[in-house]
Amino acid sequence: DNPIVKGCIKAAPGHKIVAMDLTTAEVYVAAVLADDKNLMKVFQDGGNFHSNIAKLVFNLPCEAEDVAEHYPTDRQAAKAVTFGIMYGAGANKISQQVSTDSGTFFSKTQAQEVIDDYFKQFHKLKKWIDLSSKFIMDNGFIYGATGRKRRLPNVKSDNQGIQSHEVRSGMNFLVQSVA
């Protein structure tokens, strides 16, 4: 979005330059892999993704385009949960992220409530995450959508931090091998 950079780039006659925001591409891939129609619909409806999520999760009494102005902390919480759950963040991490990004204290309890509300809306995503994580824990590997196998041998470690890292790596692999 830098105007100086944009001014340096010109399309050839008869052509157009298209800019794309792919920051939510991995979330869409997860929605498709989980077959979560509710989450896919948020993408299909267009508009600002995180505002749409916040309106849906918090049942906000405004139009999605007004969420950022009237409910900035809720929007930030929805954004933090959307990206956080993709990478294994729990209530503590999401609490810290929302507090930092919004400049407003957001407790661990509030974060857990948002996570719970998020998964009420997107229950198929939750089921997919749970089943995939269990498969990784049980087998020490996971197959991506294209059939590629990712070995995660340290998932059987006695160290909980190492186990969690392996599960996160496996979940990241599932999404990033397609995105």
Regions found by a protein language model. Give the residues of each.
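Conserved catalytic core of nucleotide polymerization and phosphodiester-bond processing enzymes
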Residues: 1-179
